[in-house]
Amino acid sequence: MNISKKVFHLFLAAIMAFSFAACVSVVQAAPFTAPQKLDPYLYYMEYADYAPDLTTGEHVKLGFACSAVRNGNFYGRNLDLDYADVPEFVIKIAANEAEGRYASIGLAAILTLKSNEFDKVSEADLLALPNITFDGINENGVAMNCNVAPAIDLDFATLRSTNYGKPRIHAVSVVRYVLDHAESAAHGVELLKNMDIYGGYGSWGLHWMLSDEKETYIIECIDGELVVRNDTDNIMTNFYVNYGSYSKYAA
């Protein structure tokens, strides 16, 4: 073997070794703790960082009813799944001052798997999991949740955009975005007015209840517009608050 071939082989070996080391270092540096199983359906994880993906949630399995309630400093919801056997996660996100992100804690679920299929969850899935946070509260006391709502009487195509030309965000990722960046409920509303919200849960729309210690808002995408209502009932179900015949079932 001549000198040039030896040099080439040594160079190739070095590249392979470096690549392997880099892969190992990436695995070791995963910015979240290993899922801690709290019961057959619930896990707990802490994140130093995550992979923001505002397109998450384009195709999410449906089939449940839910209500959200706020009473003073108490904020809660029920989630009446008709297929309750899914892995759910309590997700604690660390603050990141450089990225303007506040600390928060919330709930997410992988609705396309059964609880006994947890071994099918990849590291990439876990890294992106915070994007599908359904409910949560941040360090400023801003609490938010999303519920599905029937879009039968709406032109659902118009729900694909609320503010054309602004940065786009999938409806499923709205809670995560607000928890990360909102200083108050009113600030959360202003943040969403500057985003183009699109999508839903399959053929269903989504709406949100956003609260802090002072006030509550119901936020909905109606025929291509973001509609915000300052709400004094402090309750939201699976029916639109700001639209037609459905609004009478809102609370």
Label each region the model flagged.
Residues 1-11:
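Bacterial N-terminal signal peptides that target proteins for export
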Residues 1-2, 24, 244:
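Glycine-centered signal
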Residues 9-11, 106, 110, 225:
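Acidic/proline-rich low-complexity IDRs
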Residues 16-24:
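Hydrophobic core
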Residues 23-186, 193-202:
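N-terminal mature-domain region immediately after signal-peptide cleavage
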Residues 202-251:
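Extended amphipathic alpha-helical segments with heptad-repeat/coiled-coil character used for oligomerization
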